[in-house]
UniProtKB/Swiss-Prot annotation:
Keyword Glycosyltransferase recorded: no
UniProt-recorded Gene Ontology molecular function terms: rRNA binding; structural constituent of ribosome; tRNA binding
GO BP annotations, alphabetical order: translation
One GO CC term, this protein: small ribosomal subunit
UniProt source species: Malacoplasma penetrans (strain HF-2)
Family of the protein in this entry: Belongs to the universal ribosomal protein uS12 family.
Record-given protein name: Small ribosomal subunit protein uS12
Region (Disordered): 36-56, 117-140
Primary role: With S4 and S5 plays an important role in translational accuracy.
Key words of the record: Ribonucleoprotein, Ribosomal protein, RNA-binding, rRNA-binding, tRNA-binding
Quaternary structure (record): Part of the 30S ribosomal subunit. Contacts proteins S8 and S17. May interact with IF1 in the 30S initiation complex.
CDD domains on file: Ribosomal_S12
Length: 140
């Protein structure tokens, strides 16, 4: 522990906070061939692989994921939320931050209902998170 004299000479340094979604922090300048710091809530990318993954220990399932090559050059694993999807290799997707606790290495979510990703079919509740349109009311 630091003495009072040491604390008078030098302040305590704040701990550096690391980003939980680093791929959203940079953009790529193709003219200068450099990455520049430019944080954004979403990034566009192209699926290079779509598959399933088994979760960590107490859970059991086949979770859908996609490996996405982003416009800034990063290649990340992103979770595909909801039941059923239409994604395949070369699909253009939008990703946002947000990890999946039981899938190691998956730190991003794919936004449903944008670009090549369709919304979840027959979704009635919590539709906004799954890109589902409001169902038509039947007239009597």
């Amino acid at each position: 522990m630091a003495t009072i004299a040491q604390l008078i000479r030098h302040d305590r340094k704040d701990k550096f906070k690391k980003s939980k979604s680093p791929a959203l922090m940079y953009t790529y300048n193709s003219l200068k061939k450099k990455r520049t710091y430019n944080p954004s809530p979403y990034k566009r990318g192209v699926c290079t692989r779509v598959g399933t993954m088994t979760p960590k220990k107490p859970n059991s399932a086949l979770r859908k994921y996609a490996k996405v090559k982003l416009t800034n050059g990063y290649e990340v694993l992103a979770y595909i939320p909801g039941e059923g999807h239409n994604l395949q290799e070369h699909s253009v997707v939008l990703i946002e931050g947000g990890r999946v606790k039981d899938l190691p290495g998956v730190r991003y979510h794919i936004v449903r209902g944008t670009l090549d990703t369709s919304g979840v079919e027959k979704r009635r509740q919590q539709r906004s998170g799954y890109g589902a349109k409001r169902p038509k009311e039947k007239k009597e």
